[in-house]
Regions:
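Short hydrophobic-aromatic micro-motifs
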Residues: 69, 93-94, 143-145, 164
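A broadly conserved detector of short glycine/acidic/proline-rich loop/turn motifs that flank catalytic sites
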Residues: 79, 98-99, 142, 148, ...
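A structural signal for short secondary-structure junctions
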Residues: 86, 137-138, 157-158
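Conserved catalytic cores of phosphodiester-cleaving nucleases, focusing on short active-site segments
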Residues: 122, 136-152
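A short pocket-lining beta-strand/turn micro-motif at the edge of beta-sheets
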Residues: 132-134, 142, 161
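Long, low-complexity, charge-rich intrinsically disordered regions
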Residues: 146-186
Length: 186
């Protein structure tokens, strides 16, 4: 309940005031967050989302930046172009796991929770982008694949600085790291 109230206040008051948005645009912002919450993480098609909300694709990108600055979503970009800010948005996540349970579907996939947690914790200290071979690339050189206890290393066999992040294990070994340890970064 409380988290939902904070989200509503952020969308209905804080962002519109900060960005000087109209009431109609604030409503579209709320609809955009609802679309993201039902699908996150997902590869955004800005044109398609813009069609649903009856705004341009550029407006969707701008609204997503407002949601990200407000701490409601995280945008995972490609590493192309060398500067993270210029990379194309590859996936959109809800900012944290509490938002998944507050705004998302009742049937939350544990893989979504794991990836969201990892992305949320690492991006506060590092540059996090998409990896061509796994889930995440950190600071342009460390590759991470996030999964459960039985996650294999197939994708990372030929990757230097490749790590498997596993949930439901107490301690790591070799290039395997326990997911809970990333909670210590924050």
């Amino acid at each position: 309940q409380y988290i939902q109230q904070v989200v509503n206040a952020t969308i209905e008051t804080d962002i519109p005031q900060y960005a000087d948005l109209s009431i109609a645009t604030a409503r579209k912002l709320k609809r955009l967050l609802a679309i993201i919450a039902q699908s996150a993480p997902f590869k955004p098609n800005m044109t398609q989302i813009g069609g649903q909300l009856e705004v341009s694709r550029n407006s969707i990108a701008e609204l997503c930046v407002y949601l990200e600055k407000a701490g409601l979503i995280g945008q995972l970009r490609t590493s192309t172009g060398g500067i993270q800010g210029l990379g194309k948005v590859d996936k959109i996540y809800l900012d944290n796991t509490a938002l998944i349970y507050t705004l998302g579907n009742r049937n939350v996939e544990i893989g979504t929770v794991r990836e969201t947690f990892f992305f949320n914790q690492t991006r506060s200290l590092c540059s996090v982008t998409t990896s061509p071979v796994s889930d995440f690339l950190i600071d342009g050189k460390y590759t991470f694949e996030v999964g459960g206890k039985k996650k294999r290393q197939r994708q990372l066999q030929s990757i230097e600085n490749g790590y498997v992040v596993k949930d439901d294990i107490e301690t790591g070994y070799g290039n395997i790291i326990s997911l809970w340890m990333f909670g210590m970064l924050y």
